[in-house]
Amino acid sequence: ADRFLNAGGMRGRQLQVLVEGTYYVNRLFATVEMIEKTVIDVGNVGVVVSYTGEQGTDLSGSEYRHGELVTRGQRGVWSEALLPGKYPFNTYAGKVIPVPTTNFILKWIKNEVGSHNFDENLSEVALITKDAFEPTLPLSVVVHIDYKKAPLVIQRFGDIKKLVEQTLDPMVAAYFKNVAQTRTLIQLLQER
């Protein structure tokens, strides 16, 4: 144990992951925990939020004011997402948030849910028209997130469900409510 510490090792959980191979570990000195590799499926990228590492310098630029992006190995949201594949990732040192890069559909329909379940809390938009009718408007929106912009999305919103529920839902509802106020029910149906 002293030789390990003198050679630069540290007490506690080690950040370095042992990948496949044969290792001779002194069980009186250390224990090894087996953790499955992190899998990023095709059609997704993985945005890494690291809890360890050096304090990084912001790579997001002066125009982006919602947080900082850092390079791989530094503490914070990494500026480059993990592409599809298997990764030996220390789940105690950070987390990987999956972000879909294929088109997905959000449905503003109460009992219908898309394949990713991002829209499970969405329902039809309640409108009030110029002539005082109160129709509900079911909507479907196709969303695409560029894989290079995925770290920016996670840095700003935390995850895709929060993006949908806290930003897209209020924006879409407000837009259609504003449009409906200026039109009669017949105009709204004709121009839809």
Report each predicted region and the residues it spans.
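N-terminal hydrophobic membrane-entry segments
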Residues: 1-192
